Each structure stands twice: as C-alpha cells, then as structure tokens.
Amino acid sequence: MLPANFEDDASYDECTDDLNRVCADLANAAEDTGIALATISDNNIFFETKREYAKEMVTGFIRLNGMTVGAVANRSKVYDAEGNAESYEQVLTVDGCKKAADFINFCDAFSIPVLSLTNVTGFEATLEAEKDMARAVAKLTYAFANASVPKVNVIVGKAVSYTHLRAHETLAN
C-alpha cells in the first residue's frame, strides 16, 4: 500500500472492487469516521496509523480505484469489536491537530493524495489546551496549505468556518 521511499511509486494497484457499489451503512458512520473510511475504500480496507494516539482524530491509508490515498478525519465516537462506543467532543484538540499535521506532511513527502472528512464544531476549550491550541491549529493549517499533493475535503456533518470565528467582521475593519 505504501511506497518503499519517496522516489518509489507503489501507490497504485489494480482495483478489484466494484466502483459502483452501494455503501449502505455510510450514513450511520458519521460519528466513527474510521468505519466510514473503511466503507468507502477499495475492498473495505483501511490501514489506520497511530491508533492509540489522539483517538478523536483518525489517520490512515485507503485505496480509491486502486490508488493509495491518505485519509484524515475527526470523529466523535470510536466503536470497539463488541460495539461499545467511546465518545469524544466534536472539537479539534491539540494532539489531534498535531497528529493530522504530521500525517499530512508524511503524505506530501511521499506524493500521496489526501482525503479529509470533517465533522467539527470548534476547538477544545480547556485551560491546558489554550496554551498550545493556536500553535497546533497553525501547524495543521500550514500542513494543508503547504502540501503539494491533491487534497479533497468532504464535510460529513458540521464544520468551523470564518463565519463561526467572526473573521468577516475582524477582516472588514
């Protein structure tokens, strides 16, 4: 699924999956986007990275029509094998931003396109997070803006925008 080095192009393999298949349970996977990523990928294979770190942000690799794609998504629930759910707020966290930024930089270094699924209502609002949030969000923003690979974002729920931050009023002054 991954290239051996940055010059290798092992990111494409023949697609054996039906591209016109119906993803019946996709609507139910908005909370745990790891399930959504597995559902949309070729042969339902999702290779998750850093599974135990910043669980509210999922990163990993999927194949779409045979091409390796890096996937980044935030999630509000994580389901285990027995169907038990661990819940998270729909916010960006410091660790989640760092995890996503590092993953995007990795994908860019190996020329792997990035797909992101977004369902976030804001930023973590704790005293501890307040110290590092601006730096972490800036790192994530820079990683997305600086990456030279194709990037596609799909909003699967809510998303924070300039309107939410009231930037339109600040920038107008």
Name each model feature, range by range.
Residues N84-S87, E124-V137:
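Short glycine/threonine-rich loop-to-helix capping motif typified by GTGT followed
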Residues T163-H164, H168-A172:
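Conserved small/polar residues in nucleotide/adenosyl-binding loops
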Residues K131-N153:
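Glycine-rich and small/hydrophobic secondary-structure elements
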Residues E48, Y53-T68, V72-A109:
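Long, structured protein-protein interaction/assembly regions in large complexes
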Residues N65, V72-N74, F110, L115-T126, ...:
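Generic beta-strand/beta-sheet core signal
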Residues N5-D17, K55, L117-E124, V156-Y162:
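A glycine-rich phosphate-binding loop feature that marks nucleotide/adenosyl-phosphate handling sites
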Residues N105-L115, Y142-P150:
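Secondary-structure transition/capping motifs at alpha-helix termini
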Residues M1-R63, V69, A73:
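Amphipathic alpha-helical segments at domain termini/boundaries
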